[in-house]
C-alpha cells in the first residue's frame, strides 16, 4: 500500500490498482481528497503492471459530495472538473465502487469513471439544486448521456437521490454487487474488463440517449411550474441539460461552469446555503449539550383524536412507536381513527405504502375513553381545544395518572406552559411540543421550554423531533411563541391595510409574489373565518366578523373574503368590497391608494422587528432559529432565507428607516426594538449576533 497523502492511498490487487479514500466522516471532496485522487490515478495510469483501476472509499460511504466548508473560500488543490478529466482520459478502465451515498461532486466523480458498481443500499444523486446552485463538475452534461434527458431532468432539478436498483435500470450503474463484498466484487469486475479487453466507456462520448426534442423540456417546465415558482436554480438546471443536448461536450461543460459561478454569488444560493446550515444549528442548545442523557420513549399517549391529535399520533406510529389515543366520546375516537386510516390508505393508493403496512400502522394504536390508559406511557401529548382552563384540568388529572419520569407535553400554540406546568407536582417534566397543521406533513416542531423544564426533557423532545422527521426549534414561553407571535404582526397590518385602501386580493397578490404559498386572506378562507369566532361575542367591527355573521365563513361555505366556484377557485368578491368600503366610511377612514411596496413593507418589517424583540427577550436562541421556524412552519420561501435573513439582505438600516417613517404615520405598532436600533448603530446585522 502506497500512501498518496493522509487521506488517499493506492494498493495493488493483481493487475488492478485500488485507490482508497479515507477522510471521515463522509469522505467529502476536500482539496486533499481531490489532489490525492488525481495523483493516484496518474500514478496507476503510468504503471505498466496496472491494467485497471478501482476507486473505493473507507468508512460508511462513497464520496458524499463537495466539502461545503470550502464554499466561498479561495480554491485550493486540483479542481474537481480537472480530477474528472484525468479520470475520464485515463487509458485504463476506471471503476467507481459505490456504497452509502454518492451525492453531488461524489456522483460527478463516479460519472467520470468508465464504469460504476454499487451495493444494493447505495443512493446516488445530485442535490445541488437544494443549495440554490447546479452541479458544477459535469453532472448536468454526463448524467443525461447515461440515463436520458427525462430522468436526468428529474434527478437534477428535484435534487432527489435514486436507489442503486433504479440507477442500474437506467444505466447509471453497470452492476449491483454484494452488500458486504464491495471491494472484492469491484476488483473482480475490473479484472473481468481486462480479461475481456472491454472498451473504455467514456461518458462524454455517449450520445445515444441524448434526444433533442424541445417538447420534453417544455412539458417538464409546465408540469413543475408551481413547484419551481420563484426559484432560480431549477430553471438553471434545465438550461444546463438543454446545453448537454445542443452543444458539444466541452462547450456544455463551460456553460455549466458559467451557470454555477453566476448562481454561487446570487442571493438565492446564499439564502439556501444559510438555511442548510441554520437547520443543523437549530439542534444545538448552549446549556443542553449533546452529552445530556435522554429518556427512553417506548410508548406515547395522545389526548385528543381530532385533526391535530390524529396527525401528531401518525408521526410516532410511522416510526414504529405505539400510541395510546384518548378521547372523551366513542364517536370522536372512531372518527379520529377512521381519518387516520383514510390518510394511510390514500398513501397506499399512491404506491408509497403497502396495504399490509397500513394494517401494521393501524395495529400500533390503542384507542381508549379513559385517561388512566396513559399510565404506562413515556410521553403524553395533550392536543385538546386551545383553552387554558381545559388544559389546566387535563394536566391536573395527568399528574395523578402518569408514571414517574413520564414527559407531559402540551401542543398549545399560544398559551403559557408555566401556568399549565403549575397544575402538576412535576413542572420539570412539562414541556410544550407545538406541532403545525397538518401535523403528519408539516416539518416544524416548536419545542417550548418552561421555566422549570428539565434539561433531559428538552434533550429528549429535540431528539424525538429528529426521530419523527421534524425540525425541532427550541423556543421560550411567550404569547404565540416565535411563529404565531410574529404572524400576529403581519395579520394586524394586513387587516389595517384593507381598511386604509388596499383590498384583500391586493395584499394576497403581493405576498404571493414575494414567494409565500398564499396570502393572509386566502389563508383565512382556507382555514375557516369562524375559527375563534362566535355569534354571541361578535361586535361586527371587522370585515371578518361581518363576513361570519353573513355565514360567509371561507371555502367550506363557498364564500369568505373571496367568492368560490364549484372547483373552489377564488375570485374577488364585490360583497367583501362593499363590506370593507362601508366599514371604512363608518370608522371615518379616508381610503387612499396603497402601493405594493407599502403592502410588503408593512406586512414584513414589523415581523422582523418582532423577531428582534424575541431575540432581545431570549425567547429564541439565535436569529437563524426564527428563520427555520418560518421556513418549516409557515411556508416562507427558502430562497429568501427567512424573515431575519431577509432583514439582513434588505439592510437593517433600511428596515429601521422605514419602521420609523411608519411609526410617525401609524403610531406605536411600528416602534423599533432596542436590538434593531443597536445593530444599526453598530453597523451590524442579525448574522453578527
Language-model features: locations:
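Short beta-strand/loop segment at the start of cytosolic alpha/beta domains
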Residues: 1-23, 48-54, 230, 371-377
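N-terminal glycine-rich phosphate-binding loop for ADP-containing cofactors
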Residues: 3, 22, 74-79, 90, ...
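Solvent-exposed beta-strand sheet faces enriched in polar/charged residues
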Residues: 11, 56, 97, 125-127, ...
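A structural preference for short, pocket-lining loop segments at secondary-structure junctions
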Residues: 14-22, 32-74, 85-99, 119-123, ...
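Acyltransferase
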Residues: 43, 79-85, 398
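Short, active-site-adjacent cap segments at secondary-structure transitions
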Residues: 60-64, 103-104, 415-416
Amino acid at each position: 500500500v502506497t500512501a498518496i497523502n493522509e487521506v488517499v492511498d493506492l494498493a495493488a490487487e493483481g493487475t488492478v490498482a485500488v485507490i482508497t479514500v479515507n477522510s471521515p466522516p463522509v469522505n467529502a471532496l476536500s482539496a486533499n481528497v481531490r489532489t490525492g485522487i488525481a495523483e493516484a490515478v496518474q500514478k496507476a495510469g503510468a504503471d505498466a503492471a496496472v491494467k485497471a483501476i478501482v476507486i473505493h472509499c473507507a468508512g460508511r460511504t462513497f464520496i458524499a459530495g463537495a466539502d461545503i466548508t470550502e464554499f466561498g473560500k479561495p480554491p485550493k488543490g486540483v479542481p474537481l472538473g480537472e480530477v474528472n478529466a484525468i479520470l475520464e482520459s485515463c487509458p485504463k478502465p476506471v471503476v467507481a465502487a459505490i456504497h452509502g451515498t454518492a451525492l453531488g461532486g461524489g456522483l460527478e466523480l463516479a460519472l467520470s469513471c468508465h464504469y460504476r458498481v454499487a451495493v444494493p443500499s447505495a443512493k446516488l444523486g445530485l442535490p445541488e439544486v437544494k443549495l440554490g446552485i447546479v452541479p458544477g463538475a459535469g453532472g448536468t452534461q454526463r448524467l443525461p448521456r447515461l440515463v436520458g434527458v427525462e430522468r436526468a431532468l428529474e434527478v437534477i432539478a428535484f435534487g432527489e437521490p435514486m436507489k442503486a436498483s433504479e440507477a442500474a435500470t437506467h444505466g447509471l450503474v453497470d452492476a449491483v454487487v454484494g452488500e458486504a463484498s464491495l471491494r472484492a466484487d469491484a476488483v473482480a469486475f475490473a479484472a473481468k474488463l481486462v480479461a475481456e479487453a472491454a472498451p473504455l466507456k467514456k461518458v462524454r462520448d455517449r450520445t445515444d440517449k441524448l434526444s433533442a426534442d424541445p417538447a420534453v423540456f417544455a412539458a417538464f417546465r409546465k408540469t413543475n411550474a408551481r413547484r419551481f415558482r420563484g426559484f432560480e436554480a431549477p430553471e438553471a438546471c434545465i438550461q444546463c441539460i438543454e446545453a448537454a443536448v445542443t452543444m458539444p461536450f466541452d462547450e456544455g461543460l463551460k456553460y455549466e461552469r458559467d451557470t454555477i459561478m453566476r448562481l454561487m454569488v446570487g442571493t438565492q444560493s446564499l439564502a439556501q446555503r444559510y438555511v442548510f446550515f441554520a437547520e443543523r444549528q437549530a439542534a444545538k442548545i448552549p446549556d443542553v449539550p449533546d452529552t445530556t442523557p435522554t429518556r427512553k420513549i417506548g410508548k406515547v399517549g395522545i389526548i385528543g383524536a381530532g385533526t391535530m391529535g390524529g396527525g401528531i399520533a401518525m408521526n410516532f406510529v410511522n416510526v414504529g412507536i405505539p400510541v395510546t389515543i384518548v378521547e372523551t366520546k366513542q364517536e370522536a375516537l372512531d372518527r379520529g381513527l377512521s381519518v387516520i386510516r383514510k390518510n394511510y390508505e390514500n398513501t397506499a393508493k399512491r404506491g408509497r405504502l403497502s396495504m399490509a403496512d397500513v394494517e401494521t400502522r393501524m395495529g400500533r394504536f390503542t384507542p381508549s375513553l379513559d385517561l388512566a390508559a396513559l399510565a404506562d406511557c413515556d410521553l403524553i401529548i395533550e392536543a385538546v381545544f386551545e383553552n387554558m382552563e381545559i388544559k389546566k384540568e387535563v394536566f391536573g388529572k395527568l399528574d395523578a395518572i402518569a408514571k414517574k419520569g413520564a414527559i407531559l407535553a402540551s401542543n398549545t400554540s399560544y398559551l403559557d406552559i408555566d401556568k399549565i406546568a403549575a397544575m402538576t407536582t412535576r413542572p420539570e417534566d412539562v414541556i410544550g411540543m407545538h406541532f403545525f397543521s397538518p401535523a403528519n406533513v408539516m416539518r416544524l416542531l416548536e419545542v417550548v421550554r418552561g421555566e422549570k423544564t428539565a434539561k433531559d426533557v428538552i434533550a429528549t423532545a429535540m431528539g424525538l423531533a429528529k426521530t419523527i422527521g421534524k425540525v425541532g426549534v427550541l423556543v421560550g414561553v411567550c404569547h404565540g411563541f416565535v411563529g404565531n407571535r410574529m404572524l400576529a404582526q403581519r395579520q394586524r397590518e394586513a387587516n389595517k391595510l384593507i381598511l386604509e385602501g388596499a383590498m384583500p386580493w391586493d395584499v394576497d397578490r403581493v405576498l404571493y409574489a414575494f414567494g409565500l404559498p398564499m396570502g393572509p386572506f386566502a389563508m383565512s378562507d382556507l382555514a375557516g373565518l369562524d375559527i375563534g369566532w362566535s355569534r354571541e361575542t361578535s361586535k361586527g367591527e371587522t370585515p371578518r366578523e361581518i363576513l361570519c355573521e353573513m355565514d360567509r365563513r371561507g371555502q367550506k361555505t363557498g364564500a369568505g373574503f373571496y367568492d368560490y366556484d364549484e372547483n373552489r377557485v377564488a375570485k374577488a368578491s364585490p360583497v367583501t368590497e362593499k363590506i370593507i368600503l362601508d366599514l371604512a366610511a363608518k370608522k371615518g377612514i379616508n381610503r387612499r391608494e396603497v402601493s405594493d411596496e407599502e403592502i410588503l413593507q408593512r406586512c414584513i418589517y414589523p415581523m422582523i422587528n418582532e423577531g428582534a424583540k424575541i431575540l432581545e427577550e431570549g425567547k429564541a436562541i439565535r436569529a437563524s432559529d426564527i428563520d427555520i421556524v418560518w421556513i418549516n412552519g409557515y411556508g416562507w420561501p427558502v430562497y429568501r432565507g427567512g424573515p431575519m435573513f431577509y432583514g439582513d439582505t434588505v439592510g437593517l438600516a433600511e428596515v429601521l428607516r422605514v419602521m420609523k417613517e411608519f411609526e410617525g404615520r401609524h403610531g406605536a405598532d411600528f416602534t423599533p426594538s432596542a436590538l434593531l436600533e443597536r445593530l444599526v448603530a453598530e453597523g451590524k446585522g442579525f448574522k453578527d449576533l
